[in-house]
Amino acid sequence: MLNTELELKFAVSEADLTALSAHPALAGPRTEARLISSYFDTPLRALERAGLSLRLRREDGAWVQTLKGGYAPGDLARLEWRHRLVEPERRPGRARRPQPLRTALADTPAAPLIRGQRLRSAFTIDVTRTVQRYREDGAIIEVALDRGVLKAGSLKEPILELELERLSGDSAALFTLARSLANLAPLWPRLVSKADRGYALAAAAAQTGPSRRPARREWKALSQAPPTLEAFGAIAHHALAETTERLLDLRARRGADTLHQMRVSLRRLDAALQLFGPAVRDGEWAHVRAAGRDLAQRLDAAREIHVFLRQVSRGCGPGLRRSEEARAARESRAALLRAIRRMRAAALDEALASFDAPGASKGVMAILAWLDDAAWTRTHDATRRARQTLALSAFIAPRLQRLRRRVLAVGDKLEGLSPSARHKLRLKVKRLRYAAIDASAPFHRPGRTRRFLNALTQVQDALGDLNDLAATPKLAHAAAREAGTEGCFLAGRLAAEAIAREPAALRRAARAIRRLKHAEPFWV
């Protein structure tokens, strides 16, 4: 049986549940059941690569087989094919859990992928699910709490999720209820399915070594040439999903790389909103873009301080390395490093606290609701409709060309730009790079694309060095205030060296821009 599943999932903590219990949606009659699910795939993970998951779960005394599709681009709805196994296929001589019933998959997208292939268990999910129903704006919503564990090989990962699933009515009611719940606890949408998490854990379990961790599910550029709106949905939805996963990881581990990846995801979302603006801009577009930028800005201070800490830890020029031979300089450096670490911890605490405020989770939900509603597809603007029907290559090529012209026009004046203007140029370079990565597939020019991206990366890195140098005096003085008299000597040296190194950094950036000018665009 084919169904369409529409749901919102949230990662929660025990403290969140205590706060949420005051809401009527979690205060009514409930049922509880233990659900043990086994997920199957071919040895080469053909279903995973196709964005499908095949599950066997024990429900009400019988096995139910469910094939789920991935999330549609920019949509919370997922197709699923359910089949109750009356006479489950079993391996001869074995009385353990059944194997998937292949005949029930005959008319599904999985059929050609598993034909002639052996199916084996990839991972299992064991949760206790508490369920209740709630009415919101005329819709019936199932409110479920899953508490349990995900297992793959020798690895385990805890599960504690709140799930809102629309059983009937308007999907907008899901967001109305979610925003109401977010007033009580910092709900953060989880756009990665349990199956995706299971596959990541299974990949980690297949690795060796003591530091195995679930792998990040890397974004891959569009492999085909989808329609313009589908491409936008895929890029924006993935960027938002990466943002939510990176925040959960940042809360748990407070890693600098995670902080960086979260900022990258938000910048990529902003780049997609601007790049596809002529096709999707509506009355909410500016508000959605502002919400994404607000989330990114909450991380800026912590990232800036981390980059400064890395510079000081590694040394900042020959003068600093020579000064470390003197005892006074070594003590000054140690005091300064301690101060910068305290500054970084405080900035990260402030950022995480800001994400725990209702405004942050509501901002993410506003973006998600806008993507799900896709009101731009119902526009009466003839020009916008025409842009939406263009092939991706026809839509994106002039946009890439315009971005490139702007980058080079400003880059030609690099030496006369202020630090803030150079930073704006770097943001333009990033937008061009993200667009080139995400939308290069329709042009089928891998060599030219690679050379163009390499040139862009060099410009971005060179401008990044300039940005770091410009920020050094301010950060050095702040660190000196935090460190006290011990850190003043080295802070002054750091500020002076940053100023002295700027001319050489400017020359490197100018050379990188000249190389970009000669890099042949892949879209012409």
Where do the language-model regions lie?
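Cationic, histidine-enriched alpha-helical/coil surfaces that engage anionic ligands
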Residues: 1-524
